[in-house]
Amino acid sequence: MKSTVEQAMLFEEKSIFENQAIEQGYSRVAGVDEAGRGPLAGPVVAGACILPRGKVFLGIDDSKKLTPKQRRYLYELLLEDPEVDCGVGVVSVERIDEINILEATKEAMVQAIASLQSTPDFLLVDGLFLPHKVPSLKIIKGDARSVSIAAASIIAKEYRDELMRKLHVEYPEYGFDKHKGYGTAAHLQALKHFGPCVYHRKSFSPVKESIQEGVCQ
């Protein structure tokens, strides 16, 4: 585990894009990221986050690099801090099937930005060019390079995981609480046995194939 000093230095290193935007005259820089582009089931969720200038949040990193315990702690820390502005966007399975996952992801991001309490004047977006009235910068692997995007990734991931746990209560046979809709061996086996439920993405290949094979509920 990194020391407090090392974590503070890492936070500063990953603030380079935010600092550059501020030097250019922007003041409300929002990081934007998504969770759930790849799963076979469940919505796609986006997070947006504006971190206060001059405040260090130790441990902020790409949500995929954090343990569930670390991620949950940081999620609650961000939501409970009155100086942090967080927003969430959720796009349903039906909408994903209607417009495709890429466009649905962009739609979720726009929703997340709109749900912020204050309007950002610059966006740092993980991996996507996002058509938006607010100027933006696409950052490849931004969740590992920008603290704002990393914070947004934590918000999106935790929020979506909570949604998938709720879906598990409705359809426990699929194990949504464990794999969160991703195409694990156990999920594919359940899909083969039970067929897809209403929360499966029918435009995604394994689900589409199970429907064509006639195992749809």
Swiss-Prot record:
Pfam families to which the protein is assigned, alphabetical: RNase_HII (PF01351)
Name recorded for this polypeptide: Ribonuclease HII
SUPFAM superfamilies in the cross-refs: Ribonuclease H-like
Gene: rnhB
Residue ranges of domain RNase H type-2 in the record: 27-216
Reaction(s) catalysed by this chain's protein: Endonucleolytic cleavage to 5'-phosphomonoester
This enzyme's EC code(s): 3.1.26.4
Binding positions for a divalent metal cation per the UniProt entry: D33, E34, D126
Cofactor: Mn(2+); Mg(2+)
Keyword vocabulary terms for this entry: Cytoplasm, Endonuclease, Hydrolase, Manganese, Metal-binding, Nuclease
Gene Ontology BP annotations: DNA replication, removal of RNA primer; mismatch repair
GO molecular function, one term: RNA-DNA hybrid ribonuclease activity
PROSITE patterns xref list: RNASE_H_2
GO cellular component, one term: cytoplasm
Subcellular location: Cytoplasm
Top-rank taxon, per record: Bacteria
UniProt family annotation: Belongs to the RNase HII family.
Species this chain originates from: Chlamydia trachomatis serovar A (strain ATCC VR-571B / DSM 19440 / HAR-13)
Classification via CDD domains: RNase_HII_bacteria_HII_like
Cofactor note: Manganese or magnesium. Binds 1 divalent metal ion per monomer in the absence of substrate. May bind a second metal ion after substrate binding.
Statement: the UniProt record of this protein carries the keyword Metal-binding: yes
Taxonomic lineage from the root: Bacteria, Pseudomonadati, Chlamydiota, Chlamydiia, Chlamydiales
